[in-house]
Amino acid sequence: MEQARQVKISKFLSKHLRHTPERLGLVLAPGGWVAVDELLSACASHQFPISRADLEQVVSNNDKQRFSFDETATKIRANQGHSVEVDLQLQPQLPPPILYHGTGEKSVPAILKSGLLKMSRHHVHLSKDIETARTVGIRHGKPVIFSVDAMVMYQSGFTFYCSDNGVYLVDHVPPEYLHMMN
């Protein structure tokens, strides 16, 4: 499958598995799962046919690992980034000492004042490495990277989760745990 087609499918899946499942007539089960057959049927009935092979290729080749299959490969979900109410059934995790967050330069004043807020999402997304954070930041303009004192936050009572694709999730990062790197 061509790269352009993979990107188009990935964007379509992101939109409907994270934000608007109801537009395809889908209901996310606990954990954010939806039956693969149900998804493929819904896509076809909404003039966006996807084959099982296409779906498998998008899941396995997505560099950000946005999606995953369950153990039986009969269900699929978006790993994080939902704006719709969903319980991903993630377990609390001990974070590494430092995590990173990439953003655009225009967001810096608000972040320095209020910290990192989840906005329309369920969690703030944090990366394990600077390069991933920089890649995220570039999507928002000139990138700015913040380091996050994750272990200090954890020791102060904040709960961290880690999604299937290795992104750490937390409800909020107050400004006192943030350090602008660049």
Swiss-Prot record:
SUPFAM superfamilies (UniProt xref): ADP-ribosylation
UniProt entry keywords in alphabetical sequence: NAD, Transferase
InterPro entries reported for this sequence: Ptrans_KptA/Tpt1, RNA_2'-PTrans_C, RNA_2'-PTrans_KptA, RNA_2'-PTrans_N
Keyword NAD: yes
GO biological process, one term: tRNA splicing, via endonucleolytic cleavage and ligation
Domain of life: Bacteria
Matching Pfam families: PTS_2-RNA
Single GO term (MF): NAD+ poly-ADP-ribosyltransferase activity
Enzyme Commission number, as recorded: 2.7.1.-
Protein family membership: Belongs to the KptA/TPT1 family.
NCBIfam families xref list: PRK00819.1-4
PANTHER family: PUTATIVE PHOSPHOTRANSFERASE, TRNA 2'-PHOSPHOTRANSFERASE 1
Entry function: Removes the 2'-phosphate from RNA via an intermediate in which the phosphate is ADP-ribosylated by NAD followed by a presumed transesterification to release the RNA and generate ADP-ribose 1''-2''-cyclic phosphate (APPR>P). May function as an ADP-ribosylase.
This protein's name: Probable RNA 2'-phosphotransferase
Organism: Trichormus variabilis (strain ATCC 29413 / PCC 7937) (Anabaena variabilis)
Gene: kptA
